[in-house]
Every structure is written in C-alpha cells, then in structure tokens.
Amino acid sequence: CTMNNHNFGCDFGSYHLKIYHRDADAYLIQHNMVAVQDKKGLLAFGDEAYAMYEKAPSNIQVTSPMSYGNLASISNMQAFLRNLLERNIKGQLKGAEYFVALPTEMQERIFTTLIQDSNMKPKGVYLVDKPVAAGLGLGINVKEAQGVMLVDIGAETTEISVLSLGGIVISRLIQNGGRSIDDAIQSAIRKEYNFFIGSKTAETIKKELAYAVEPEQASMQICGRNMVIGLPQMMEVTSDFVYEAIKEQLGIIMDAVKTILERTPPELGVDIIRNGIYLTGGSARIHKLDQLLEQKSGIRVIVDEEPETSVVRGLARVMGDREFRSLAFVTKEQKYE
C-alpha cells in the first residue's frame, strides 16, 4: 500500500504564515516571526516568538523571515516551516506536495528553492499567483473571461491586480500596508504628545480606532513612555486623532488603485464597474475603508468576511478542485514527473 502523502497550501505573509493542510482540512495560522538566540539558534517561532517581540534582551533577535513581500532570511523561514509542520503534523513530511502563493514581483525560484533545500524532501512545489489565489478564496471563478479587480492590503505591501482568464492582466505592489499605517499612528503620537508607544500598541489602536472616513466618536487608554519625564504613563487617544494620523497612508493606497484603474483596458474596466472591486488582506478590516475606496473610485466595493485568509482559502480550492488545478505551475527549471 502507498503512504498517503501530505498536501500543504502556504501563504508566506510578512505578518502571518498561513498553511492549509489538505489531509486534515485544517488551517495553521501563526505570526511569521522567529526568535533567534546568539550562539544557540532558533529559540521560538510563530505566536510564541511574537509574544517576545519588543520585549527581548539584546542576545535574542526577534524578526520576521519575510520583509516587504520578499524573503529576508531563507534559513529562518526554513527552520520555522519545518518546525511548525513537525510540531503539528503526524507522520512523515517526506514526499509532501506544496502549493505556494507567489506575490507579484517575487522571483519564482525563491519559494521553490526554500522548500526543496529544506531537507523536508518534498515530492513537488507548485506556485499559484497570489492575486489569483485571493480571487479564488473570495469565491470568484477567476478562469472566466471577466475582469476582476482585487486590492489586497497586507502587513507590509498592498497588491493591486486585475485578473481575467486565470491570469494577471495588470498588477502592482506598493510598499505600504498595515505596518506603515501603524507607523503613522506611532509617529503622530510621538510628534503631538511627546509620547512613545510600541508597534504592538499602535496596531491595537488601529484595530480599535482607525476609520477611513467620518470617524465615530471613540477613544481608548494606551500605555507608553512620556518622553519629557522619561517614565511609563497612560494617556487617552481618540478616533479623530487616529483618522488624521492615517489619512496620508490610506491616500497613497487609494492613489495606487486609481493608477491601476487608469491603466486597465476598457473592456475589462466595464467588467470591474459591473462586478465591483474586491478588498482583502488584514487591513481590509479598517473601519469604513470600503466607503473610502468607493468614494475615490466611484465603483462599489466588496469586502471579504475573513480578509486575512482569502489567499490560503484560494490555495485550498486549487488543491481540492480539479477545475482550478491548472492555475498552479512549476518554476521553469523544475519538472515533476
């Protein structure tokens, strides 16, 4: 009898590593972070490493193996992936097949090499263009002769794409996303109040108080360091303040969407007006962001209910549905029998 080989769908985000395990029909989602200790190597990974972020002593580096949609450290990413799978998957990893979401402008070879050289001995590594996977995850049949526009606002990048016939007609990646919105909140608070907060606190503020248009009246207590007296302190921040702080960053993303719309062939433009613009990625959760995009583009916007996982859900469809299997490809050097 043959051993049942595992199948994995992998979305290597800068903020979360998302894996779909086909055999168990289960998702593994962890912060894409590793903690590496001097002379000792990998100390912790995933959510456990994230808990140490901004709290570790100088001999422990807590970093993400991904940076701005590219791989910052292949060895850290390999160690994380291997450890995560070994910890969660029963049985052999050898002979597994991997379906990996490939971001715009990322070289095809990178992920193939990452997995093949990781001593996990895969049977095959297949790539799916990330916007195509996101479209499938949103429930769109991306193989039709229909123009579909996706705006995927990730942690460090925003990917804006127009799809048709299973491929990317036009796509652009900008280095603005959730992280740059957090940074804008952090620096506005530092400038206005001489008050220093960590990036995790900035992220919490974004989740609670960020509005893209007409903020509702809300506020929260935050903890940080009063830079005048140099001591930790609590202070209150309001939704109005956050609205002003993030306006410019959101504007950059809106302008990039307009640029892509202007470059879209007219026949596909007609489809986009009819079908709407799909908004996904973790920062799609910013309150009323769909309203801002509707105002700026004049086109209705559909927001994914679970925007963080649209890509990995799309990979699950490629793996599970024969109709979409053809959307996966191998890098030119690689041929699997």
Model-derived features: positions:
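Nucleotide/phosphate-binding catalytic cleft detector across ATP-hydrolyzing
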Residues: 1-150, 163-277, 284-311, 316-337
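A structural feature that tracks compact, well-ordered secondary-structure segments
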Residues: 159-161
